[in-house]
């Protein structure tokens, strides 16, 4: 199982970015959670058995690749810090409130 934690900076809150992340993750079969942090960043925990899908998902989050021709229309990602992570397995991908 491949698991990562991403901290996404830029204009990523209040612009539908978390919903874009959810749609993109579900299309790729990625499981995990996404939420807003108090410092204006968005945090993502993502897991999959397929390393290539995780790389594709990371590229979509960074804005380097579109998800089925879509990019997050109002978000402006300026930085993504990604690192391997250890967390309990998820069975879906949703927003954590």
Swiss-Prot record:
InterPro entries: Acylphosphatase (IPR020456), Acylphosphatase-like_dom (IPR001792), Acylphosphatase-like_dom_sf (IPR036046), Acylphosphatase_CS (IPR017968). Its EC number is 3.6.1.7. This is Acylphosphatase. The keyword Hydrolase applies. Residues 3-97 form the Acylphosphatase-like domain. Disulfide bonds: none annotated. Gene3D superfamilies: 3.30.70.100. The keyword tRNA processing does not apply. Pfam families: Acylphosphatase. Keywords: Hydrolase.
């Amino acid at each position: 199982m491949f698991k990562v934690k991403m901290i996404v900076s830029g204009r990523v809150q209040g612009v539908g970015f978390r919903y874009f992340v959810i749609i993109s993750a579900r299309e790729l079969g990625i499981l995990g959670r996404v939420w807003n942090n108090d410092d204006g960043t968005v945090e993502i925990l993502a897991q999959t058995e397929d390393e290539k899908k995780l790389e594709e998902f990371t590229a979509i989050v960074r804005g380097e690749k579109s998800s089925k021709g879509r990019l997050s229309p109002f978000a402006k990602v300026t930085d993504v810090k990604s690192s391997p992570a250890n967390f309990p397995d998820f069975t879906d991908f949703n927003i954590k409130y």
